């Protein structure tokens, strides 16, 4: 069995996008990377919600962690005898946090966990709430490291991999999901080539993923999103490895826009397709991808690059930021609970219940 014991975490796991100071939440501003490394300081839950919506912090696990700390900040001004009474006062703040990004299930999952913590808490509810947020972050980091080893174990030595969007330390508590598998695969000398799609329109691949890999000393080749099929045709890629914002009960997976077309191209070219996400991303109450709300962002995001407009005035734009990849196009879903090969409703139910 592949293990994480031979991974140098001092080298491969040092970026942290979320920092709790005890008084405020510091978020690495991912809109300004890679050329400006700057933190946004949030002093209340509404500032956290605004930062999530504005993509200051992004990536499904990181969004959930930030929201949990947002609840802790909201609790600062609440006076209540126990957690149940505090929850009544905190509910509006929780609703605003929940509305900040609708597609990522980790956000609702983290808030539900904070609600459960409050419901059972006594007079020490504030301390328990802070401990719960810290536990969510620590558990995510441990899960990522375990998933990295599990996913890397599927990859044959000498393989090339292609990833999409950013699924690394910047999107999680640390190490990453899909990028964690790539880090583990590089550390174990299984991966010989890494390619990253630019990921329009926010360019998470170009701005964030290749920057993260550079920090680790991992050589990565950036490609235009539209070059992916041609790259697969050359035989340079054996695995496409992506993260997820929501995984349905039948294995259908919502992820960054462009993931679905990668899965189609991968199947056509005989390239394996891996989804890597913590079990908190699995939503067994959502039967299939048709039930997922797909976030639509400002069409203006498509009108230019880096603040410079490149599109004529009066042009309409359609800007969904997620799509759904059918489970039948996925070869493996990797969570900290294990690997689900060729996901179906049956083997998803066997792994996660429901």
From Swiss-Prot:
What species does this protein belong to? Answer: Stenotrophomonas maltophilia (strain R551-3)
Please tell me which top-level EC class this enzyme sits in. isomerase
- Binding sites annotated in the UniProt record for substrate: 58-60, 101, 204, 255-256
EC assignment: 5.3.1.23
Q: Give the reactions, separated by semicolons, that this protein catalyses.
A: 5-(methylsulfanyl)-alpha-D-ribose 1-phosphate = 5-(methylsulfanyl)-D-ribulose 1-phosphate
UniProt xrefs under NCBIfam families = eIF-2B_rel (TIGR00524), PRK05720.1 (NF004326), salvage_mtnA (TIGR00512)
**Keyword Amino-acid biosynthesis found:** yes
Give the lineage. Answer: Bacteria, Pseudomonadati, Pseudomonadota, Gammaproteobacteria, Lysobacterales
The answer, when asked if Amino-acid biosynthesis is one of the entry's keywords, is: yes
**Metabolic or biological pathway:** Amino-acid biosynthesis; L-methionine biosynthesis via salvage pathway; L-methionine from S-methyl-5-thio-alpha-D-ribose 1-phosphate: step 1/6
Kindly provide the name given to this protein in its UniProt entry.
Answer: Methylthioribose-1-phosphate isomerase
| Signal peptide positions on this chain | none
């Amino acid at each position: 069995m592949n293990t994480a014991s031979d991974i140098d975490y001092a080298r491969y796991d040092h970026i942290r996008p979320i920092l709790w100071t005890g008084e405020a939440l510091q978020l690495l501003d991912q809109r300004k990377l890679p050329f400006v490394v700057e933190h946004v300081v949030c002093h209340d839950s509404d500032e956290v919600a605004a930062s999530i919506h504005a993509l200051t912090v992004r990536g499904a696990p990181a969004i959930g962690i930030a929201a949990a700390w947002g609840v802790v900040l909201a609790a600062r001004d609440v006076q209540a005898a126990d957690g149940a009474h505090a929850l009544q006062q905190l509910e509006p703040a929780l609703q605003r946090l929940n509305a900040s990004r609708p597609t990522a299930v980790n956000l609702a999952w983290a808030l539900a966990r904070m609600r459960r913590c409050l419901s059972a808490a006594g007079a020490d509810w504030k301390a328990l709430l802070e401990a719960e947020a810290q536990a969510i972050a620590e558990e995510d980091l441990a899960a990522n490291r375990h998933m990295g080893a599990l996913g890397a174990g599927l990859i044959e030595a000498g393989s090339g991999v292609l990833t999409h969007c950013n699924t690394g330390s910047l999107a999680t508590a640390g190490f990453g999901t899909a990028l964690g598998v790539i880090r583990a695969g590089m550390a174990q000398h299984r991966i010989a080539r890494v390619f990253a799609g630019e990921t329009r329109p926010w360019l998470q691949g170009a701005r964030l993923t290749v920057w993260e890999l550079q920090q680790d000393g991992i050589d990565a080749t950036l490609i235009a999103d539209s070059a992916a099929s041609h790259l697969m045709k050359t035989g340079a890629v054996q695995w496409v490895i992506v993260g997820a914002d929501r995984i349905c009960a039948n294995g259908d997976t919502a992820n960054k826009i462009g993931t679905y077309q990668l899965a189609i191209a991968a199947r056509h070219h005989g390239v394996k397709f891996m989804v890597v996400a913590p079990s908190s991303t699995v939503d067994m109450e959502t039967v299939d991808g048709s039930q997922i709300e797909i976030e639509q962002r400002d069409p203006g995001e498509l009108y230019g690059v880096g603040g410079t407009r490149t599109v004529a005035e009066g042009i309409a734009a359609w800007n969904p930021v997620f799509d759904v990849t059918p489970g039948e196009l996925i070869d493996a879903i990797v969570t900290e609970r294990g690997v689900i090969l060729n996901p179906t409703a049956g083997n998803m139910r066997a792994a996660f219940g429901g």
